Amino acid sequence: MTRIKRGYIARRRRTKIRLFASSFRGAHSRLTRTITQQRIRALVSAHRDRGRKKRDFRRLWITRINAVIRGDGVSYSYNRFIHNLYKKQLLLNRKILAQIAISNRSCLYTISNEIRK
């Protein structure tokens, strides 16, 4: 059997992985085995947190809207506000409503008073 000379392929692969892990601390940026383990772990975390970010932002928007709505009227909640929005066919998503709640509260109060009728 003839000998297969791989040249610099393995070194190129390792340097590519090292570049990925260059900002890691300690052995996680120096030793090849730990670099590969940490790389897998980092990519798993990134994949998981991309989905998680969507949930977290939705929760934040709902919290902001609810805080402003409850400040307007004590007996009025986020749940009723969204329900009335759908009944009146005002299609504003939660992100936009949260931005309105932060930047222009009087506008959100106007919207809530209009749909409450």
Curated annotation (Swiss-Prot):
SUPFAM superfamilies: Ribosomal protein L20. Gene3D superfamilies: 6.10.160.10, Ribosomal protein L20. GO terms for cellular component: chloroplast; ribonucleoprotein complex; ribosome. The keyword Disulfide bond does not apply. It comes from the Eukaryota. Pfam families: Ribosomal_L20 (PF00453). GO terms for molecular function: rRNA binding; structural constituent of ribosome. The keyword Ribosomal protein applies. It is found in: Plastid, Chloroplast. Belongs to the bacterial ribosomal protein bL20 family. PANTHER family: 39S RIBOSOMAL PROTEIN L20. This is Large ribosomal subunit protein bL20c. It comes from Carica papaya. The gene is rpl20.
